[in-house]
């Protein structure tokens, strides 16, 4: 998946964000509007309004999650303004990611934390389309969730050394390094979805359904599909970038991307689709990385 993009496309290895803080909503707004935070108005998921001394929630409003505080037009909005017959679809696990990426228009879907269903809000539509409602009724997302997370590859093929909850293939569950620390308790379907590679698989699965249901890219009118993957950030924050959990997630994401790209290029004529893969921020070594980082200084 990643190799197909790097070898078949253009890689901008020195790109960076010229501001702080590069949190997810801030940088997603920058990516989708092309504007700096001082222009697009998103400075965090919440902040304190110094004129009222009240906390402002980025996406909270009377009509449910929406782009109430995003003041610059997004790519989706601009496309729909100039080509009203286009479709702009945005899919993300988290409401904030979906809302900020989409802006004020288009079809926007995210995961409900209670039932793991795909939902939208009255800000965008009265209800989800029937093909999503049917998937929700059939509890299709639960098919992605497993009670156990086991490494995709044999333990010896991993470069990272830390593991907490993941089961190491090729070792007995009784082995000490496989017992896990219980650092992250996955008590709900929503957590099992977003704190494991299943989150990526589910999002890309819905993206494929959207392409098929809406027949995106099949005519001369341009369409836009925004896909946000929040699970890599959540897994990295939960386990640390040096963890086997993070490394395994990227191996699985590579396969998910390969499957998704194969599907996309099978549906759309060659040369008539542009794929952009980017990130809202990077990561830093864990605070307790210790001796592994000592040789940097």
Where are each of the predicted segments found?
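Short secondary-structure boundary/capping segments
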Residues: 1, 103-114, 239-247, 282-297
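Second-shell loop/turn segments in exported
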Residues: 1, 15-18, 61-66, 190-197, ...
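Short, structured active-site-proximal loop/turn typified by the sulfatase FGly-forming signature C/S-X-P-X-R
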Residues: 1-29, 34-38, 87-90
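Stable alpha-helical elements in mature extracytoplasmic
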Residues: 2, 24-28, 71-75, 203, ...
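Generic, well-ordered alpha-helical scaffold segments in large soluble proteins
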Residues: 8, 78, 82, 206-214, ...
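A structural signal for short, well-ordered beta-strand segments and their strand-loop junctions
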Residues: 14, 87-93, 226, 276-278
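His/Asp/Glu-rich, glycine-adjacent segments
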Residues: 35-221, 229-237
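Metal-dependent active-site segment of extracytoplasmic phospho-/sulfohydrolases and closely related
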Residues: 252-294
């Amino acid at each position: 998946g990643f190799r197909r993009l790097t070898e078949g496309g253009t890689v901008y290895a020195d790109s960076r964000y010229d501001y702080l803080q590069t949190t997810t909503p801030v940088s997603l707004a920058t990516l989708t509007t092309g504007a700096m935070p001082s222009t697009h108005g998103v400075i965090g998921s919440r902040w304190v309004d110094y004129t009222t001394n009240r906390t402002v929630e980025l996406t909270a409003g009377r009509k449910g999650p929406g782009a109430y505080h995003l003041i610059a037009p997004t790519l989706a909005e601009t496309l729909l303004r100039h080509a009203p017959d286009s479709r702009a679809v945005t899919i993300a696990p988290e409401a904030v990611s979906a809302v900020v990426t989409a802006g004020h228009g288009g079809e926007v879907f995210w995961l409900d934390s209670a039932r793991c269903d795909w939902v939208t809000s009255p800000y965008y539509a009265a209800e989800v389309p029937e093909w999503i409602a049917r998937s929700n009724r059939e509890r299709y997302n639960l098919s992605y969730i497993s009670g156990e997370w086991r490494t995709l590859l044999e333990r010896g093929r991993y470069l990272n050394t830390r593991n907490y909850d993941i089961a190491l293939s090729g070792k007995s569950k009784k082995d000490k390094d496989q017992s896990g620390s219980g650092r992250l308790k996955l008590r709900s379907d929503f957590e099992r979805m977003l704190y494991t590679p299943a989150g990526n698989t589910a999002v890309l699965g819905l993206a494929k359904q959207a392409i098929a249901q809406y027949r995106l890219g099949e005519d001369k009118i341009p369409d836009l599909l925004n896909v946000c993957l929040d699970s890599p950030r959540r897994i990295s924050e939960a386990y640390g970038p040096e963890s086997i959990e993070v490394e395994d997630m990227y191996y699985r994401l590579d396969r998910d991307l390969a499957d998704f790209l194969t599907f996309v290029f099978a549906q759309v004529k060659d040369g008539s689709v542009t794929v952009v893969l980017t990130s809202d921020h990077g990561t830093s070594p864990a605070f307790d990385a210790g001796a592994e980082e000592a040789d940097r200084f």
